[in-house]
Every structure is written in C-alpha cells, then in structure tokens.
A protein has these predicted regions:
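Rossmann-fold cofactor-recognition segment
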Residues: 46-59
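Aromatic "clamp/platform" in nucleotide-sugar-dependent glycosyltransferases that forms part
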Residues: 89-93
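A hydrophobic C-terminal alpha-helical subdomain
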Residues: 22, 214, 238-239, 248-301
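General small-molecule cofactor/ligand-binding pocket signal
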Residues: 53, 244-248
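Oxidoreductase cofactor-interface core, primarily capturing Rossmann-like NAD(P)-dependent enzymes
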Residues: 2-43, 58-61, 68-72, 78-88, ...
C-alpha cells in the first residue's frame, strides 16, 4: 500500500468527508484540503487521523503545497451559492487540476452527478428549465471534460445519484430546511436512483486501490432505486416524527419551494438520472440500500 497521501477536496463536507473516512479506515494517508483548519469539522478530521492542509480552490497558489507529493486527488467542486450563475465550479476544477498536474499527481477521482452525460439539447433549455438548472448541468459537463483531458495517468469519474441524506433535515428538500414537509414537485411514484454518501467513499477507495482497472471509468453511482413515496414510507417506519408529502405540486409550491428548485425537480422527471445499483456492483463495489441507510439515519437522530 502506498504511503503517499491522497489529497481530498471538500473534506469538511458530505462527499469529501465520506471519502476521507473511507480512506482512513483502509489505512490510506489522507491530506484534507480545508480553508479553516480551526473549524469543528476540520478538527474532527484531524482527530480521525487526517493531515489538514490549508487551501482554497479559488486561489491557485494555495493549492501548490497541498498537491505536492500526493499520490492522487479526490476532486469535488461546487458552485458559489452567493453567485449561482458564475463559473466558479468549472474554474475551481481547472485550478485543482492544474496544481495536481504541476505537482506530478498521477491519479484523480472526480465526483460529478448522475446524468451529466446527457447531451440532449432540450436538457439545457433555459426557457423551459430556467437559467440556473441549465448552467448547473453545463458546469458539471465542463468540469468532467477538464478532468478527462488534463493528462493524468489514470482518471475516474463518479456520477452519484441523489443523496439519501437529502431526506434528513436540515435539507433544501424540506420546506424551511427543518420542517417535516417534503418540498418536492416531482412525480412521487416514479422510481429514481439514490446513493448513500458513504458509498461515494467506498467507490473512491475502490478506484484508488486499482487505478488501471478504473482508468477511464465513468460510473453512474447508485445504491438503490425507488420512488419518493416508497422512500418516505420506509423513513416514516423508523422515524419518531413522520415526513409529510405534498398532495400535489401546487401544495409543495405553497409550502415555499424555491422556483429554481422546482424547475430542477421537474427537469429530473423529464431527464431521469440513469444511475442504478447494478452498475457499481458490476465493478465489485458494494452499496447501501435505502432501507439500510434509513435504519442507520434513525439511530443517529
């Protein structure tokens, strides 16, 4: 096993945190990129055994030292939520990739989103879906291109499905973030893919452990496929306080679902995410079912 560290971006967030935990549990050295080493989340990473390195994806110079000597990079970028229409996500990917290539890093695992391979022009119709959903998907596609064309010896792209964790408060999916009202305008009875965030860590670990096998793999990553109605039924069977589903899209909007989120949800119904559990299983990656996740989430309440 290599003693060179893996540089993990987004380490204090959901995905990066899951990756850091999976690597540490497997005995892989983790270099966690954080903007504020004094934060509580950073402290928990350090206590778990990660080495904290200060850096900011918006500051290319700050990435040089963290990338130096790393065996691989876990790449996960987001938009700037204070300026959703800017190109921060793509630029952050470019900054990280440039620093990693300059440092001689040979492997990258990049996390995108299920469905980012859809090139149907209708999927980017701003008049139909709004400016932000179209921009969001273009950014995901462009960030993937940046990774693929950077010249790493080996690269892997993960396209996770919707997070199971989105159905646990606080979450944007709930009216007011913390209520028990699920603010969705989607079709409640159509099966959709789900992933437990911990499985992103599992998949990343698998790719890092076998770079050649996973080189060029674009994995649509899911642990289960079931409808929103069925997901809520499972959760309500283990929760002390039930989640309330809207009786119709109009009710969800009355609960205060942001228009941009409603547009994104409608797009999801028209262009459903293609990830399915068997895609990960075919590569030997074990995943978490929704029921398994729900019971674990209930225990942590």
């Amino acid at each position: 096993m290599t003693t060179e560290p893996v540089l993990v971006t987004g380490a204090t967030g959901n995905q990066g945190g899951a990756v850091a935990r999976a690597l540490l549990a497997a005995g892989r050295p983790v270099r966690a990129l954080v903007r504020d080493p004094s934060s509580a989340a950073a402290g928990r990473l350090a206590a778990a055994g990660a080495t904290l390195v200060r850096g900011d994806l918006d500051d290319p110079a700050s990435l040089e030292e963290p990338a130096a000597g790393a065996a691989a990079v876990f790449s996960m970028e987001t938009a700037d939520y204070a300026n959703l229409m800017a190109d921060f996500e793509v630029q952050r990917a470019r900054n990280l990739v440039a620093a990693a290539r300059e440092a001689g890093v040979e492997q990258i695992v990049h996390s995108s989103v299920s469905g980012a391979g859809n090139d149907d022009p209708g999927a980017f119709d701003e008049e139909r879906w709004g400016a932000f959903p179209a921009h969001y998907w273009r950014s995901k596609i462009e960030s993937e291109r940046v990774v693929r064309e950077a010249g790493f010896r080996t690269w892997t792209i993960l396209r996770p499905a919707g997070f199971m964790e989105n159905l646990k408060q606080p979450s944007l999916w709930f009216a007011g973030f913390t209520s028990n009202r699920l603010g969705v305008v989607n079709d409640l009875d159509v099966a959709r893919p789900w992933i437990a965030v911990q499985d992103i860590g599992t998949a990343t670990l698998a790719a890092l452990a076998d770079p050649r096998r996973f080189h060029g793999v674009v994995l649509e990553l899911a642990g289960d496929a079931l409808s929103l109605r069925r997901a809520v039924e499972i959760l309500n069977s283990v929760r002390s306080t039930p989640i309330e589903l809207p009786s119709a899209p109009e009710q969800a909007l009355a609960w205060g679902v942001p228009p941009e989120l409603a547009q994104s949800q409608r797009r999801m119904d028209t262009y459903p995410a293609p990830a399915r559990p068997e895609m990960a299983h075919a590569l030997g990656i074990e995943t978490t079912t929704f029921e398994q996740w729900a019971h674990g989430a209930a225990r942590s309440e």
